[in-house]
A protein has these predicted regions:
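Extreme N-terminal leader/targeting segments of oxidoreductases
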Residues: 1-10, 28, 240, 251
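Accessory "access/gating" subregions that flank catalytic or transport cores
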Residues: 3-5, 222, 234
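Loop/turn elements at helix/coil->beta-strand transitions in domains of secreted/extracellular proteins
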Residues: 8, 29-32, 210-211, 231
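N-terminal Rossmann-like FAD-binding beta1-loop-alpha1 element of flavoenzymes
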Residues: 10-35
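Short hydrophobic core segments
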Residues: 10-13, 220-221, 233, 245-250, ...
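Acidic, glycine-rich active-site loops and adjacent beta-strand->loop/helix elements
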Residues: 16, 39-41, 220
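Conserved N-terminal/central alpha/beta ligand/cofactor-binding core
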Residues: 38-213, 237-259
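A conserved short coil-to-beta-strand element within the FAD-binding core of flavoproteins
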Residues: 216-229
Length: 259
């Protein structure tokens, strides 16, 4: 059996948005990370989602005319939590999520506010707002990913060539036969990607631009631990079952879950 050992600051299991965002953030803070994806393609469950991100008091909504207070955002979140969410964590989310959005924008990830919808989940409860607090990834061409274009999972259950805002404005998926056919054809030729797929592609582009190591077909078999603390993992590439690569983390192992 051939074996190899490598050391990183952060070892990330899974290439959905959590893994990609974690790798991007790690790099910006001067840490070396590696992403291990079990599947042959990138994206995890994120590519099958609409990729909406709820961020109260975000700068994109404010620039589009949304005026709201921190107290309103907190009231809405507390209503959604129903008393079952630790208030310190809830407050941290409300206070930090707008800055996290700005942080990833500075990293080159492009977002847009979703206009034309009221607040997500409930629109007439304490703290709710008539203007959407949701943002989505801007459309990105798959060709911007170079050789990685074909290595991102493309869903067949979500129309990714339109933004969520456009889909809502055009009457939803049931009205798809009446959408702008010329625009749809143009975007398909350009391989424009939005929603969860677009979100993954935006983050993957930023990660690849920074030289972060991304490995697919990595079947993680074992987590290494030292005094109860996870310190690394052992993976077996699907195409080379006789080769075991042990990846040791100097700081953290980040694992995502998929159903």
């Amino acid at each position: 059996m051939i074996s190899a050992e490598r050391s990183y600051d952060v070892v990330i299991l899974g290439s959905g948005i959590a893994g990609l965002a974690g790798a991007l953030a790690a790099h910006e803070f001067g840490l070396q990370s590696v992403i291990l994806e079990k599947a042959a393609s990138i994206g995890g469950a994120t590519v099958h989602s609409y990729g909406l991100i709820w961020v109260g008091q975000n700068h994109l909504a404010q620039a589009a005319g949304c005026s709201e207070s921190r107290d309103e955002v907190l009231a809405y979140m507390r209503f959604l939590g129903g008393g079952n969410v630790d208030d310190d964590r809830l407050t941290a989310f409300v206070d930090w999520s707008p800055e996290v959005l700005r942080f990833f924008e500075r990293c080159g990830v492009r977002f847009r506010v979703v206009r034309g919808v009221t607040d997500h989940y409930y629109d007439e409860v304490p703290g709710s707002h008539a203007f959407s607090r949701s943002v989505e990834a801007d459309l990105i061409s798959g060709f911007e990913l170079g050789d990685w274009r074909e290595r991102v999972a493309v869903p067949h259950d979500v129309p990714c060539f339109v933004t969520a805002e456009e889909q809502i404005a055009w009457g939803g998926v049931n009205s798809a036969p009446h959408w702008n056919a010329a625009l749809v054809q143009q975007r398909n030729r350009q391989d424009m990607r939005g929603k969860g797929l677009g979100l993954v592609c935006q983050f993957l582009r930023a990660v690849l631009h920074r030289g972060v190591t991304v490995l697919t077909n990595q079947n993680v078999r074992r987590l290494a631990a030292d005094n109860g603390r996870v310190t690394g993992s052992s993976s077996v590439p699907a195409s080379l079952s006789e080769r075991v690569t042990a990846l040791f983390s100097r700081l953290a192992v980040m694992a995502q879950t998929r159903r």
